[in-house]
Amino acid sequence: YLPQTNQAVNSFQIPKNINDHGGQTRIFMPRYGLINERRHQLHEVIRLSGMNLVVNDVDMPLIIKVASIPKERMQVYFIDNEEYFKRRAVLRDEKDVLFADNDERMIFFTKGVIETVKKLNWSPDVIHLHGWFTSLFPLYLKTYYKDEPIFADCKIVTSVYAKDFEGVFSKDFQKKVAFDEIPDKE
């Protein structure tokens, strides 16, 4: 769905190999504006959409779209929000500058995936995170969602990629995470 990078290839190949050996995987990714919904046959899943997620004291609507990868028996769930993911780029603008709201986009994506997994009533054995954009998952599972039984036995694996993130977040990043009552020490 995105340009070929090591991260994109691994995000597909690892779950494909697990499925090929009898496992059950689901892929979650942001529905970036450069993803062609018609060509990839994305459609909204009404029963999963419709909730608002609070990010930095603002209610943001969560839209869940899904597509299947032909011949692979794999579903991809797209976390969508017009304000965060409509732009026709992934993490940087046309001048190669990181978007100022990437921190809020990370929070929204993290909470969106977790809430969607809860609605699916699917208890994953392993969550495999790819890249810095997913780096808040362990923090949110350990704190904000610590009492969710669906994640009680879940293990987390993280893949970090070279030159995945070069930059700094806004000074307000910690405050935005703290809004979800996540202590500074975490």
Language-model segment annotations:
Residues 1-186:
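Catalytic cores of nucleotide-sugar-dependent glycosyltransferases that transfer UDP/GDP/TDP-activated
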